[in-house]
Amino acid sequence: MDSIQQDRLSSLPDILLIMIISFLPLKECVRTSVLSKRWRYLCLETTNLSFKESDYVNPDITDAEYSRIVAYRSFFCSVDKWVSITQHQVVESFEICFSHLVGFEDKIDALIEYAVSTRVKNLVVDLSNPSWRSNGDISYRHFMYTLPKSVYSLTTLESLKIYGCKFDPSKFVNPVLLRSLSIGWVRLENLHSLLSKSPSLQSLSIKNCWGVDITSMAGQFRELVIEHSDFSYMQCAFELPRIHSFKYSGELFEFYFDVVNVIIPNVYLDFGEERVYDLQSQSSRISGEVISRIINDLRAAETLTVCPYILQVIPECEKPSDLLQPMETRHLVLRTKMHTKEFNGIILLLNNCPNLETLGFDILTPCPFSATSSDEGIDPKTYWMQKRTCKSLRKTLKVVVIRNFCGSSNELNVLRYLIRSASGAGDALERVELYVPNGMEESQAMVVFAKAEMLQRTSKHVQVLCAQLLKK
C-alpha cells in the first residue's frame, strides 16, 4: 500500500476502517495490523470471523497421519487464541469449515456455542469433505457431526449454511429473520417445518442431500437451487409467485410450478445425471414429455439454460411441436456436445422462442467430435443446409455466442445456418462471438481463428469476433 492510499485511509474514522477490513478474509484482515500503530489492534474488532481448514492446513501433508493431526491441533490453537481475545466483540458473521471431525468434536461445539453467544446474523457450519463428489462418497464410515441444540433457538439468524452436519429443521424455534438458507451433504427431513416458520426466506439452496421428504414447496423465494439431491417422492409442486432464479441439476424429477411470476429472469435445467442412451425408447419418450411439461411451466423464463439430455429427448415425444408451447425466452443457452442427436432439439427450442435475442452454445467437451455418418436419419453434412424457418432468427435474434469453440464441422454448419436464416428481413443478427477454450495448442488455435476469419468473409452483414476464453 503506497503512502497516498495510506493517507486517504488515515483520514477515515476507526468505525469505517473496521467496516472495510471486515470484508477481507481473516488472514488478510490480520495483515493490516502491521500497517501502522493505529492499525495494530483494529483487526481484533472485525465483525466477520471465518476459520477455514484450507487457510491453515497445507493439503500436501494430509497423507501423513501424525503430521495431519499436528496441523489440525495447530489450526484449533490459532482459532482458540483469536476467539479468546475477541470474546466481547460484536460478531455479525461466523464461519467454520473443517472436514476431519474425529477427535475435534468438542472444539467444533465450543466454536458454535461462541457464535451463538454473540447472536450472529450469518452462520456457516461447513463440515463436508472436499473429496466428496457425490452422495455415494458418504458411507457409515464417515462420522457425521450433530448440530448443537443452541443453534435452534438463535432468533437473530438472517443467513444459515449447514454442510455435512446432522440437524433437525423442525427444531428451529422462531427463524423469522432468516433470509438465506443453504443445506448440503446431509439427510434432509422435516424441511417443510422450517420453511413454514420462515416468512422472510428469499434464497434456498439444497445441494447433495438425500431423503428430501417434501412433496410441495411454497413461499416468497426469489432464488431456489437444487443440485444432485435425492427426493423421497417422485413429484413436487412449487408455488413460488416471486421466483427470480430457479436452478435444478440432477436426475429427472417431476416437479410442477403452480404459480410463477409473469417473467422469471433465470432458469437453469440440467438432467445430465440421466443415463446416456443410443436408441429411442418408451422411456425416453416419457422423459421427453415430462421435460416438455416442465419447460411449459417455466415458459416465462427470460433466460433459459438447458443440457444435452433435454435437447435429445424433447423431440422424441409424440407430436413434440404441439406439446411444447411458445416461450417468453429472450436469452437461450444450449449446453451441448454438438451431437447429431441434439439437432432436432435445438430446432424445436428455436421454433418455440419467437422473441429470442441472444443464443448461446456452451460446448461441453473441449473439442467436440465431428460426426460424419448419419444418426437416426440425421446427416450432419446436410441437416443444416435444409430450409428450416424459425421466426426469431429472422426478426429478433441479435447475438450468437459459442463458448469452447473448436471450429468443428458441426459448429460451423450451425453457424452458417443461423447467419443464413437471419439474412434479409431487416438483418436482425448483428454479431457472432466465438470463444476458443483455454489450453488449446497455439497451432490448433491458429486454425480455429482462420476458420472464424473465413466465416466473417462469407457473412456480409454480421460481425464475427473470435477470442480466447478467459479463465474463471
UniProtKB/Swiss-Prot annotation:
SUPFAM superfamilies the record matches: F-box domain, RNI-like
CDD domains, per the entry: F-box_AtFBL13-like
Pfam families, per database record: F-box, LRR_At1g61320_AtMIF1
PROSITE patterns documented for this protein: FBOX
Keyword terms: Leucine-rich repeat, Repeat
Superkingdom assignment: Eukaryota
Keyword Repeat: yes
Limits of the F-box domain: 6-54
LRR repeats: 58-87, 135-164, 183-208, 225-250, 283-308, 338-363
Span of the signal peptide: none
InterPro entries registered for this protein in UniProt: F-box-like_dom_sf, F-box_AtFBL13-like, F-box_dom, FBL60-like, LRR_At1g61320_AtMIF1, LRR_dom_sf
PANTHER family: RNI-LIKE SUPERFAMILY PROTEIN
Name of this chain's protein: Putative F-box/LRR-repeat protein At5g54820
Source species taxonomy: Eukaryota, Viridiplantae, Streptophyta, Embryophyta, Tracheophyta
